[in-house]
A protein has these predicted regions:
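Sequence contexts marking disulfide-bonded cysteines in secreted/extracellular proteins
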Residues: 18, 52, 56, 123-125
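Electrostatic cytochrome c docking/interface patches
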Residues: 19-46
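Extracytoplasmic/secreted proteins, especially bacterial periplasmic and envelope-associated proteins
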Residues: 38, 42, 46, 78-82, ...
């Protein structure tokens, strides 16, 4: 009886080790930074210094005609990559100038700003 039980356990173990790796989706850079409190803190500080203080206001309070970045009604850019492009390149014929990679840590800082905005954004349908 014990030999049968041990054989079944070994067989089950071998079947479980079929060599196939489980498929897990890689996190995006925004998802990675959203899970990192230090990255979110840096994103918030950069947002307050570069975005909120100039045009967009702090967490939902817009200034002048700039977009509220914490709601779901974005006129320009829906995906993280589109938002990245808008911030780096700007929007022609608007007050939104392109920042390029002019952050102290380059593109990583911009991704941290995007992660912060996404983290604080109200849930979208």
């Amino acid at each position: 009886m014990n030999k049968v039980l041990i054989s079944l356990i070994l067989l089950g173990s071998l079947l479980g080790c079929s060599g196939e790796e489980s498929v897990t989706a890689e996190k995006t850079i925004v998802e990675t930074f959203s899970a990192d409190p230090q990255a979110l803190g840096r994103g918030r500080a950069l947002f307050q210094g570069s975005c909120a203080g100039q045009c967009h206001g702090i967490e939902g309070f817009e200034i002048d005609e700039a977009e509220n970045l914490f709601d779901c009604n974005w006129q320009y850019g829906e995906t993280d990559q589109e938002i990245f492009s808008v911030v780096t390149e700007g929007i022609p014929d608007t007050q939104m100038v392109g920042f390029g990679s002019n952050f102290p840590e380059g593109d990583n800082d911009l991704w941290k700003i995007i992660a912060f905005v996404r983290f604080k954004q109200e849930p979208c349908d």
